[in-house]
Swiss-Prot record:
It catalyses: tRNA(Met) + L-methionine + ATP = L-methionyl-tRNA(Met) + AMP + diphosphate. It comes from Magnetococcus marinus (strain ATCC BAA-1437 / JCM 17883 / MC-1). Its cofactor is Zn(2+). It comes from the Bacteria. The lineage of its organism: Bacteria, Pseudomonadati, Pseudomonadota, Alphaproteobacteria, Magnetococcales. Residues 543-572 are annotated as: Disordered. PANTHER family: METHIONINE--TRNA LIGASE, METHIONINE--TRNA LIGASE, CYTOPLASMIC. It holds the Pfam family tRNA-synt_1g. It is an enzyme of class 6 (ligase). This is Methionine--tRNA ligase. GO terms for biological process: methionyl-tRNA aminoacylation. GO terms for molecular function: ATP binding; metal ion binding; methionine-tRNA ligase activity; tRNA binding. Binds 1 zinc ion per subunit.
Length: 686
């Protein structure tokens, strides 16, 4: 039996859980539930990330202590996760004695190993607020890509990390005043000491290929010292040999994975060392967002290695959530938090929809609300629940709830379902949830075809067909039960209801798909899932929009400039001259996956894209003038639309073998077109 420890990134105790966060927690929870369903020893650890200046300042603003604030947020987060059936084996806090002791141990062992350096630095200081400004309380322009309104430690657009003093046009995020530079003694982790070790670790299969490639870029730039200290006042752990200095939150936050495990082990009588002080007793997996890759795949394994702890077996990164093809937006009502969603809709709708779109890659996931309604209604209500709702009533009313004592002839369907289980299990294991859902729905289609072919509603009208009616319904319900076992990691609540329907003496396990139920008495069928109502989705969006703050009025000059810009663009947006159908059909539009993207040296607007057009058409190189709106990293793995038969064009930087389609007036307002989920590279757009 495998022993598996799984973590999700720790939610910060300064805000609500929203649908973007839930991508990761639902993805992780599905993976954990799958392993438990298979009989593996798998524990899921998480905690609130509680330290840092934002917590301290918010608590001051609300007139409470930081401890009171994080305790309040802990309760709220736990309730939100429970509402979406995210089931942690331990949900703890980084503001714990276990975390303090482990953080100190990691620091002291690295210090004693010569991996800590003390240096005097120039640091941003707000004279108005009389405090050194932490990274996240400085906003400005990224020194690498020029993106505006970025944090003082890392850029959300290009993922670069830097020191706050490197930020251009910096301002205090609290009061808006321009900070001054002031010297301060800080403690640095010598990351470059672990360069060789990290290169080997990264290439050992611990990361997805695209993430390993991204890390290679940072090695090419050279690893830098990492500032692990912050000046007081600060809510966090004081550094043992440095009064008035505190551990930076990114040192004690990942240590929270270990502290939560330790807390859990003490409660359960389990050996903590088997998980974190040796690597031959258990597997350790981290699920994270791609925006925190740097911390989890460079700093974290280096700190662990330097202090004698084991490193993760693998780190799985996922992309961001978009809604209707765009970033979550409060003004559009698509920045939806967990409580807003659950007030209107069944959380298992979202669990299934995310599962139906999640892959093992680092692709962004789009929550298309129209597709959401259609897919949930079609797949779960129309294909899965429909099997039980059409047949269970006949068994209860006509046969006192009893399935056939001997499983009937079913043309090999049950065996086919059982054999498909290994393929589905392999897809779950590899985090190819979308493919797993597709495989399950193909089975559901087969089961529904069986029902259509044998028409139990017709058999019920003929007294001479009573035995055949029981047989058809028994087969259908057994197929339904198998489908629900396959779906149990995704739909735990509905699976529990189905267990009650079948009078299951124990919760379903994966091995239950091996044999059909015979002679079992089932309970009366109870409604399992309603259709998604578009009206409720619209009401949810409207409620989220109403809670969004009113837009800040623009100065008259800015408004005038915007009007002039819109007027100039009107001519560009005028309808082009008509063409006939045959002319249009000469344009060969294809689905393409952006396999790679990088900046073009010497070009201000261009990105070089490597497009995958499937096995037949292979790859193409295309230069696209979209650099002002997208970083190269944002594009990797995305699907787009390309004009595939455009004649190659020789450019200064190389030959462009096509054109990707985009909308927008230009500048920073460019949006590449993406096909809906399910489209495959190379498919022609008609």
């Amino acid at each position: 039996m495998r022993r598996i420890l799984v973590t999700s990134a720790l939610p910060y105790a300064n805000g609500h859980i929203h649908l973007g966060h839930l991508v990761e927690y639902i993805q992780t929870d599905i993976w954990v539930r799958f392993h438990k369903l298979r009989g593996e020893e798998c524990i899921y650890m998480c905690a609130d990330d509680t330290h840092g200046t934002p917590i301290m300042l918010r608590a001051q603003k609300e007139g409470i202590t930081p401890e009171q604030l994080v305790n309040q947020m802990h309760k709220e987060h736990a309730q939100d996760f429970a509402a979406f059936f995210v089931q942690f084996d331990e949900y703890y806090t980084t503001n714990s004695e276990e975390n303090r002791l482990l953080s100190e141990e990691i620091y002291l062992k690295n210090r004693d190993g010569g991996h800590i350096e003390v240096d005097t630095i120039q640091q941003a200081y707000c004279e108005h607020d009389a405090m050194f400004l932490p990274d996240r309380f400085i906003r400005g322009t990224c020194p690498h890509c020029g993106a505006v309104d970025q944090y003082g430690d890392s850029c959300e657009v290009c993922s670069a990390t830097y020191r706050p003093t490197e930020l251009k046009e910096a301002k205090c995020a609290v009061c808006g005043s321009q900070p001054v530079e002031k010297s301060s003694e800080h403690y640095f982790f010598k990351l470059q000491d672990f360069s060789d070790y990290l290169k080997e670790w990264i290439q050992s299969g611990t990361l997805q290929p695209e993430m390993a490639a991204k890390l290679n870029e940072w090695f090419e730039q050279g690893l830098k010292h990492w500032d692990i200290s912050r000046d007081g006042p600060y809510f966090g752990f004081e550094i043992p040999d440095a009064p008035g200095k505190y551990f930076y939150v990114w040192l004690d936050a990942p240590t929270g994975y270990m502290a939560t495990t330790w807390h859990h082990c003490k409660k359960q009588g389990i050996n903590f060392d088997d998980y974190w002080r040796r690597d031959d007793k258990a597997e350790v997996y981290h699920f994270i967002g791609k925006d925190i890759l740097y911390f989890h795949t460079l700093f974290w394994p280096a700190m662990l290695h330097g202090s004698g702890f084991r490193t993760p077996t693998a780190v799985f990164a996922h992309g961001f959530l978009t809604v209707n093809g765009q970033k979550m937006s409060k003004s559009r009502g698509t920045f939806i938090n967990a409580r807003q969603y659950s007030a209107f809709l069944n959380p298992e709708y979202l669990r299934y929809y995310y599962a139906a779109k999640l892959t093992s890659r680092v692709d962004d996931l789009d929550l298309n609300l129209d597709d959401f309604v259609q897919r949930v209604n079609s797949d779960l209500v129309g294909k899965v629940v429909n099997l039980a709702s059409r047949t269970a009533g006949f068994i209860v009313k006509r046969f006192e709830g009893q399935l056939c004592a001997d499983y009937p002839e079913d043309d090999g369907l049950f065996q086919q379902f059982h054999q498909a289980g290994e393929e589905i299990a392999a897809l779950y294991e590899k985090r190819e949830f979308a493919k797993a859902m597709q495989a399950i729905m193909r089975l559901a289609d087969s089961a529904n075809q069986y029902v259509e072919n044998h028409a139990p509603w017709v058999l019920a009208k003929d007294p001479l067909q009573s035995q055949r009616l029981q047989q058809v319904c028994s087969v259908t319900l057994n197929l339904f039960r198998t489908l629900m076992i396959f779906l149990k990691p995704v739909l735990p609540y509905m699976s529990n209801q189905v267990e009650q329907l079948f009078n299951a003496p124990q919760p379903f396990v994966w091995q239950d798909t091996a044999a059909p139920l015979q002679g079992v008495t089932i309970n009366a069928f109870k409604h399992l899932m309603s259709r998604v109502e578009k009206e409720k989705v619209d009401a949810m969006v409207e409620a989220a929009r109403e809670e969004a703050p009113s837009p800040t009025p623009q100065p008259k000059q800015q408004t005038k400039e915007k009007e002039e810009k819109n007027k100039k663009s009107a001519d560009k947006d005028a309808l082009a001259a008509s063409i006939d159908f045959d002319t249009f059909m000469q344009v060969d539009l294809r689905v393409a996956r952006i396999a790679d993207a990088h900046e073009v040296e010497g070009a201000d607007k261009l990105l070089q894209l490597t497009l995958d057009l499937g096995e037949t058409l292979g790859t193409r190189t295309v230069f696209a003038g979209i650099k002002s709106s997208y970083s190269a990293e944002q594009l990797k793995g995305r699907l787009t639309v390309v004009v595939a038969n455009l004649a190659p064009r020789k450019m200064k930087f190389g030959i462009s073998e096509g054109m990707v389609l985009a909308a927008g007036p230009g500048g920073t307002d460019i949006h590449i077109l993406s096909p809906d989920s399910g489209a495959q590279p190379g498919q022609r757009i008609k």
